[in-house]
């Protein structure tokens, strides 16, 4: 009995407790032609994700800014885009409480040469759409992160 307890204690103290798993890293680029280079990727539920959006274009933010807004499954991109388009002073991110609930994560708006990284964990399986919320961009700048069960 004492040996079993001793073995258990040694195992507990020898194992790093609370060791954080490094996030899986993805990079998506966007450009002056209003496209993302990727339409999506797949992760496992509970996996920490670090996503970098890099604007490889040359046009400045004021003229051709892009972002990446990750939304909850089932969110209508057309409806979300309509509300986002009215929010220029807020980086084209809706501010009403109901619509804000649909946002999982969002990068800053980026001009040519800029980049931003967001880190998030998607715990529930499903298809999480993402889009650029700059008016007129969502129809061609969208994709899906598919989350598979563990």
Language model regions located:
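Short edge-strand/loop segments of extracellular domains
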Residues: 68-78, 138, 147-150
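N-terminal edge beta-strand
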Residues: 23-49
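Sec-dependent N-terminal signal peptides
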Residues: 4-15
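Extracytoplasmic/periplasmic beta-strand context in beta-sandwich domains
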Residues: 66-67, 143
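Extracytoplasmic beta-sandwich strand-turn segments characteristic of Greek-key/jelly-roll folds
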Residues: 75-124
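Sec/Tat signal peptide C-region and signal peptidase I cleavage site
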Residues: 16-21
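Extracellular/periplasmic metallocenter environments
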Residues: 35, 105-150
């Amino acid at each position: 009995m004492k040996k079993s307890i001793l073995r258990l204690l040694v195992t507990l103290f020898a194992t790093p407790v609370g060791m954080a798993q490094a996030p899986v890293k993805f990079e998506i680029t966007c450009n002056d032609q209003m496209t993302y280079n990727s339409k999506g990727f797949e992760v496992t539920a509970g996996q920490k994700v670090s996503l970098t959006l890099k604007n490889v274009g040359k046009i400045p933010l004021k003229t051709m800014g892009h972002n990446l807004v990750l939304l909850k499954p089932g969110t209508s991109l057309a409806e979300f885009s309509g509300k986002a388009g009215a929010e220029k002073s807020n980086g084209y991110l809706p501010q009403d409480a109901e619509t804000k609930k649909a946002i999982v994560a969002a990068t800053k708006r980026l001009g040519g040469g800029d980049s931003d990284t967001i880190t998030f964990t998607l715990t529930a399986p499903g298809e999480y759409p993402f889009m650029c919320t700059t008016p007129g961009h969502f129809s061609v700048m969208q994709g899906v992160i598919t989350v598979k069960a563990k």
